[in-house]
């Protein structure tokens, strides 16, 4: 409601002169309901009077699957869950009451999932019953076919976290929200409005239903009501948020003591708040060192006396500040020392680019120490193992190694499951939730939790966290050795999921990893790739190759790079 607040971040802008237009008009209707399964009550929410009206009782034995089936058996449904574990559990529970559909497209899609992901993957079983779930990385071809099947009405119901709901425009008639939490924190009004905006899309329908469902006693009724009734509040820039401001004095204390790890702040703040406060601290130290007047420095000004400012400036001169707010000076110094000592990425050997697994684990453990993952990444790559310190890093190394070698998803999952078989005491985890102390290789549910976790690791750890740290290592390596480019750059390998130059070229041209692997298969390579004057060209027949993902991507790439295609 107040976008002008962000102009305060820009110097010499007169905010009083800003003009804005706000509208509450919407071309579609949304009907919102609150279903309290714990109390057995159903309510309709009136958006105009901002009130709840009781519309009936809910049978005590009713579960989420009963509600979804009763309301949306002939409609398109999206069920939002706040964790990957719940996505899988709720989807399986719901689909268990549905018959298998005799539909060729669903049967074909289910078979491809078994081949490309895993034979025991719940997703394949669910697809045949008109249900799907989304918990992380999926091959492009499968993801697009799931979305198309939903648009076509063959798939009726998708269970997912906020990632898919917010990122895809799907024609849902009903949205079921099973929690007011997004991960480990409560949803705010903006997140809620963005979530409910997924139903009632003018392209597909003129109205949609939103069902907020309270399924656990620990979830507070008032929090659901607040989301329904509260307007989006005026926004503050993050440094001025109450949750952040109350810790600013601790930031000053830590910095005055020369503590860039912000020990006091870390002990007092939540992980999410600490991440933001750490970035503020890095900007603040640079502002003081360079004597810059910025909104960040002004936010600290009332908490800063001459003595504190002097100590901070003394502890953090310009050369001890960082231009990258994701990495502090101490991390950068540690990294430079590591690279100058001769550290390189693990070597690739032989025709198949073999990597010594223990060498890779050792390299990752060195990065863990350099970048202080145990402090800054303690929920993922910095987490200590339950039976040995490096067991979590070893688990990620298994997936990382298969990823950069260009293995398909089924191979990556196969090796992830094999690792768990050999190390059952590493337990069964989905995100930060421990599902079992010991992995049981004969348990289909354990296998599917590992599959879900592996998909999440690829999307959130490999392609985000590890990729980012490898990027910094590669930049530092180039700087120390005065290189523009070097062989064996694992940052590239992670980004493209391969060490194969052809696959990297195709991805640089715009194809996804899976489509690139499809194109480079010997039979397809002969059909679709042609070398002209030393340059690789793509035959236009690829536009009708029969692979939905490849066809979709090829049309987009041809539009942007027509010179890449020939008849």
Predicted regions mapped to residue ranges:
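Conserved segment of the helicase C-terminal RecA-like domain
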Residues: 170, 174, 180-230
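Glycine-rich phosphate-binding "P-loop"
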Residues: 32-60, 127-134
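Conserved C-terminal RecA-like helicase domain
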Residues: 22-25, 58-157, 181-190
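Post-DEXD/H (motif II) to motif III coupling segment of the RecA-like Helicase ATP-binding lobe
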Residues: 1-31
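C-terminal helicase module of SF1/SF2 nucleic-acid helicases/translocases
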Residues: 206-302
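A conserved mid-domain beta-alpha-beta active-site/ligand-binding segment of alpha/beta enzyme cores
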Residues: 48-71, 238-257
């Amino acid at each position: 409601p107040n976008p002008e607040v962000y102009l305060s971040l820009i110097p010499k802008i007169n905010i009083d002169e800003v003009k804005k237009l706000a509208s509450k008009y919407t071309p579609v209707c949304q009907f919102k309901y609150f279903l309290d399964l714990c109390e057995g009550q159903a309510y309709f929410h009136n958006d105009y009077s901002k009130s709840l009206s009781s519309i009936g009782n809910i049978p005590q034995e009713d579960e989420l699957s009963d509600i979804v089936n009763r309301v949306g058996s002939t409609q398109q449904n999206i069920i939002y869950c706040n964790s990957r574990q719940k996505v899988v559990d709720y989807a399986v529970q719901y689909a268990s009451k549905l018959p298998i559909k005799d539909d060729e497209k669903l049967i074909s899609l289910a078979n491809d999932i078994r081949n490309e992901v895993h034979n025991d993957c719940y997703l394949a079983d669910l697809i045949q019953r008109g249900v799907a779930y989304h918990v992380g990385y999926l091959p492009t071809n499968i993801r697009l076919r799931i979305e198309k099947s939903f648009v076509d009405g063959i798939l009726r119901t998708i269970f997912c976290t906020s990632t898919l709901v917010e990122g895809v425009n799907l024609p849902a008639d009903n949205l079921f929200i099973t929690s007011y939490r997004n991960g480990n924190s409560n949803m705010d009004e903006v997140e809620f409005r963005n979530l409910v905006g997924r139903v009632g899309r003018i392209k597909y329908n003129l109205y949609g239903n939103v069902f907020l469902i309270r399924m656990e006693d620990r979830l507070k009724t008032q929090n659901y009501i607040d989301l329904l009734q509260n307007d989006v509040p005026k926004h503050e820039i993050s440094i001025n948020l109450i949750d952040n401001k109350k810790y600013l004095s601790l930031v000053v204390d830590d910095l005055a003591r020369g503590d860039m790890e912000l020990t006091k702040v870390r002990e007092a703040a939540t992980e999410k708040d600490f991440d933001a406060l750490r970035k503020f601290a890095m900007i603040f130290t640079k502002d003081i060192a360079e004597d810059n007047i910025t909104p960040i420095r002004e936010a600290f000004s009332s908490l800063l006396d001459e003595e504190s400012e002097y100590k901070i400036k003394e502890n953090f001169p310009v050369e001890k500040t960082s231009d990258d707010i994701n990495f502090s000076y101490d991390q950068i110094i540690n990294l430079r020392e590591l690279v100058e000592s001769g550290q390189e990425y693990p070597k690739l050997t032989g025709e198949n680019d073999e990597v010594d697994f223990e060498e890779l684990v050792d390299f990752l453990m060195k990065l863990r120490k350099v970048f202080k993952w145990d402090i800054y990444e303690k929920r993922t790559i910095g987490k200590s193992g339950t039976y040995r310190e490096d067991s979590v890093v070893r688990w990620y190394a298994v997936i990382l190694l298969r990823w950069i070698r260009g293995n398909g998803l089924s191979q990556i999952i196969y090796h992830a499951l094999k690792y768990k078989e050999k190390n059952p005491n590493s337990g069964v985890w989905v995100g930060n939730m421990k599902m079992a102390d010991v992995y049981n290789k004969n348990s289909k549910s354990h296998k599917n939790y590992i599959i879900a976790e592996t998909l999440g690791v690829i999307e959130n750890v490999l392609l985000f966290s590890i990729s980012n740290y490898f990027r910094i290592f590669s930049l530092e390596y180039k700087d120390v050795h005065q290189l523009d480019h070097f062989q064996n750059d694992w940052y590239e390998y992670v980004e493209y999921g391969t060490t194969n130059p052809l696959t990297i070229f195709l991805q640089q041209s715009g194809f996804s990893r899976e489509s690139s692997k499809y194109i480079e298969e010997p039979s397809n390579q002969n059909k679709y790739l042609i070398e002209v004057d030393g340059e690789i060209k793509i035959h236009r027949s690829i536009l009708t190759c029969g692979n939905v993902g490849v066809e979709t991507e090829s049309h987009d790439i041809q539009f942007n790079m027509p010179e890449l295609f020939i008849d």
